[in-house]
Amino acid sequence: MADADGGSNLAVLDALDSARTQMYHMKAIVIAGMGFFTDAYDLFCISTVSKLLGRLYYQPDGSTDSKPGALSKTANNMVIGVALVGTLMGQLVFGYFGDKLGRKRVYGVTLILMAACAIGSGLSFGSSRKAVIGTLCFFRFWLGFGIGGDYPLSATIMSEYSNKKTRGAFIAAVFAMQGVGIIFAGLVSMIVSSIFLTYNKAPSYKGNHDLSRQMPAADYVWRIVLMIGAFPALATFYWRMKMPETARYTAIIDGNAKQAANDMQKVLSIEIEAEQEKLAKFNAANNYPLLSMEFARRHGLHLIGTTTTWFLLDIAFYSQNLTQKDIFPAMGLISGAAEVNALTEMFQISKASFLVALLGTFPGYWVTVALIDKMGRYMIQLIGFFMMSMFMLAMGILYDYLKTHHFLFGLLYALTFFFANFGPNSTTFVLPAELFPTRVRSTCHAISAAAGKAGAIVAAFGIQKLTYNSQVKSIKKALIILSITNMLGFFFTFLVPETMGRSLEEISGEDGNTGAGGGGAPAAANAGVGVSASDVSRDEKFPASSTEWQTSMHA
């Protein structure tokens, strides 16, 4: 990329690209990442309480059935899937407004919506089970709507704040907070259910059908678990409101290079030339809309690649997470439903979810953070899809054998989670935040993420039907279908180029170059990309102290 003093890019953007990692970046990761912590907690805690909802609201008094009450297939799919529908719509709406109004202006709205609807979910009361479940679904939809907005905004903000050498790690670190949220969903559910178990002893379902429901204590438990999701969102809101607009949006979209330079001088201890004349030429070369032949020529294949891979990944990833409760009995991690009471079953499901997340899900996210700017996004995504496909195929074919060999089953199951997160679950989030021009970056990330949530909806309303009630033949079929899905993701990855080590303007072609290259080409490697010591040893520095951060946040 050209130098700032005579090249095609703006000095303020070059300064961001070559700035050393400082406290500014760390604070931004935490602020954006806490949104993803909340997202994951809110989306995945429903899996730990859905069986409890079935016992409480779908088991009539005086029941003589051999098994406790369970949500109907329709109710189960709605309770779990409605938040995903809301997420898809929220991604598209907030992604669009993130480009039209600014990243910062709509960023805090997502947290307020998440906090309010998490509380509303726990306060879902009604005179009948239909009223309770219907009210819960209403709040879960709008909770998902807020969660959806966090995807394109957090990814875009982090990519536009980052330097080019460690941009992948920064964006991946924001997304890795999803892993922490999944762990806490299991941990909080486990703690709350265990506290209520201590003071509310009850026989198993076999011992006494009615007493095993543990009413009214059990009715408080699921409500508390859902409402706890509001606290991290509220705790982060103040800091989000203090974040400055990204320099890239201010300069390129608002057309105010002087303001962008002034903002960054409060964050970077340097003098930056405003370059208003260069900005006019810069914008003239990039003033094409999303729905244009120019965009299709430059980025059409890239958008197809990011949408298809995220769609296919989320079919597998959400199937894994949302159907855990149905697969755990086959792995020997939880007792049969009739052998335990309501809160003991919830505790066992939560404990199993926590262990799988801690040992399989969580490490994969952070291995990606460590290696994404060394191996590249492209290779990590290929490896992840391939390994997920192989492990799921093995589990599907050997399912009957694995049911009696719990350790091996658990190991294979955990490895699929590891390679999902050290793989496409992380990279499909990172790549759309880097590939597309500033003018449509948030929208394109939103379209890609919405395609992913469409895959999650397929998982919730389709794959879940196969695993419902832990039927052996159906689970085997589901695992083989997911193996094929992952292999398709492997092949569609060839449409997505490598972005490692280059500036956002170079990747998107905004600096006058041709952009990221054709689909399937690891463009960074082909272009001889690398970051020299001089790129990161310049005098531009982010503030090291929290005082300087506070100053920059008020800019």
Curated annotation (Swiss-Prot):
PANTHER family given in the database record: SOLUTE CARRIER FAMILY 22 MEMBER
Family, as annotated: Belongs to the major facilitator superfamily. Phosphate:H(+) symporter (TC 2.A.1.9) family.
Q: What remark does the entry add? A: Although related to the sugar transporter family, it does not transport sugars.
The identity of this protein, by name, is Inorganic phosphate transporter 1-11
Region Disordered: start-end pairs: 506-555
User: Which keywords belong to this entry?
Assistant: Membrane, Phosphate transport, Symport, Transmembrane, Transmembrane helix, Transport
- Any Pfam family from its record, for instance, is Sugar_tr
Domain of life of the native organism: Eukaryota
Topological domain spans for side Extracellular: 50-77, 127-130, 189-216, 320-351, 399-408, 464-477
- Return the GO cellular component terms, semicolon-separated: membrane
Membrane topology (Cytoplasmic): 1-28, 99-105, 152-167, 238-298, 373-377, 437-442, 499-555
- Biased-composition ranges for Gly residues? 512-521
Q: How does it sit in the membrane?
A: Multi-pass membrane protein
Q: What gene, per UniProt, encodes this protein?
A: PHT1-11
Q: Where is the composition biased (Polar residues)?
A: 544-555
Origin organism is: Oryza sativa subsp. japonica
| Localisation | Membrane
Induction per UniProt is: Specifically induced by the mycorrhizal fungus G. intraradices colonization in roots.
Mind telling me which residue stretches traverse the membrane in this protein?
A: 29-49, 78-98, 106-126, 131-151, 168-188, 217-237, 299-319, 352-372, 378-398, 409-436, 443-463, 478-498
